[in-house]
């Protein structure tokens, strides 16, 4: 026991035997682990609330006035001026995510240094286990008299810098042998081989009527992609509406479009349990609705936008969600409508008026209508379906990490805004992270195909001889960490809302045999409506069933479960629930429950320390929930019996309607302020303020291309056969060794097992040279430290 304690807390040289060259935690003495498998709790006054010191993210100067002192700890001025939930030992550390605020592929979090990669995904997609009911809009109202419309359509900004231009060629002309599977896991015939994109949906927001708003704007969501209109081009007149009510009716409050007795038109969004009276709604939503969301102005407005957008279509029965907000009144929600455009074949819907309604029974909304039109165009064999860097305009840098950078980009053919993660192959091979990098892409493909509503979707993956590219939906609300840092902490209802949506995301991953392993605020994104999306699967592991274990020592220090540090037999998916307990404690209390001045003490706190709850912050049900998640014995931890379903049944969530939550019909407690689809105000200015022209010059100064043998490590990342990559590499190398050559179409989930990749990696790694300034010291990456 003495030797073990010395080795754990830095007083000895004990190391766990492993084939990995990376630092791994020592095994535990079972007797000591049994004695400390539960978290003891203490309370102290709320005056001791504090915000932890976090290092890698910029914090505005005014934030220092909002933070509280940690008990028995003097406030210290950091060189970066940052306050984070990370220990001070990480002040000079590189960011653990490549994204200051982004999508699931945004992060570039990596695993333990020199750790041998985990197994690849050895299977294709599973059947979709999440099949929400598609709620088809059935309205057939007569349009009102035509109003004045602006002739100026929405135009893209003309002064956007474009770092890359056309210096990277395309490989679209190559006829590769492609293996493709559909959403259900069935292999497609050669005739139907293509990228995941099956067509495009053009949506035009024309105008609205009887909207009680001063600065209305519209958020359109389709398959996790978002479009935010600018301010209206003009406003029409406000005569008595042809819908049978005048504008003065709003003075007494808008009518609830979901009352069954209201009006002749059907509901735009059928609601489960919509027959419940407001008095029968769960208490959480009674509290939310007790404060009016909408203070109506005296006169209604008829905004005219004529703004259109094009969505890349992946699914066949996806919903288009249209929500209207008022930017002049703290983004007040005015109403929304959902329709399901037919995407089975070419289809066109002329303009129609849709009635705006509430998201939940009893919610106050405007009594207006919105006029839209849409057109779906299916791709045929003559349409280009191979993509590369030259198919995107690069707008802004969003984040940097160990392996690369994340950009906000605009797809040239559709003007759709995405997030693009660019990973350096040289750095990946040097750090022996090939398997985890490709594994991240595989998990994104699998989760995107299963249409999980709370996981960022992967739209494209391709590669050049020097880099890997992952293109995902852009989440304009930024990282949850950005908002947590700004506000210090959240109230219990807001924390509960985010936790509940995270439980649904983890439930989806665990049911698909995926353990996440890196849950933290930096890896949780907010969309334009305020819902969460889980991102960054660089540390995730697939093919881990309920009883399966894994041994890789990875994650972020403050969120590591004790069994990762102590159990030589490995750990299970229960590590995600431990991290969830740490996260909800941070959100509600404002600091990490296991914070310490140094890493060794933090490990000790995780293994044996007490959790101290501040007074009057968490309800008894909330404390019980956190204690259940922070049980040090994973076999007794909340969720050990029935995974996420056990968490959902906890009394803490007694007021949650999980069906409504899964359908995103519960109003989020917070709506990010968004002014346009390219708005980056919710992202860290440390990254977004960088000059993209300078980044362009850095990217153009390509390093020496990799050999064909090393390139073989990345086979399977795209939909090309083994020879295409080498042939393309050879041609591009002869043409210009310092010009990043062409790119390829999105990737194939059928990848080689890690044994093949590892063999290639070991043979070729000695041929590589990587500039030392491309990566930080290993000990400062992702909180990985020697025990």
Swiss-Prot record:
Catalytic activity reported: L-seryl-[protein] + ATP = O-phospho-L-seryl-[protein] + ADP + H(+); L-threonyl-[protein] + ATP = O-phospho-L-threonyl-[protein] + ADP + H(+)
Keywords annotated in UniProt: ATP-binding, Kinase, Nucleotide-binding, Phosphoprotein, Serine/threonine-protein kinase, Transferase, Virulence
Disrupted-gene phenotype: Leads to reduced cell size and to sensitivity to rapamycin, caffeine and sodium dodecyl sulfate. Attenuates the virulence of in a mouse model of systemic candidiasis.
Enzyme class: transferase
Compositionally biased residues, Low complexity: 132-155
Molecular function per GO: ATP binding; protein serine kinase activity; protein serine/threonine kinase activity
Catalytic site: 518
EC number: 2.7.11.1
Descriptive protein name: Serine/threonine-protein kinase SCH9
Source lineage: Eukaryota, Fungi, Dikarya, Ascomycota, Saccharomycotina
Name of the gene this protein is made from: SCH9
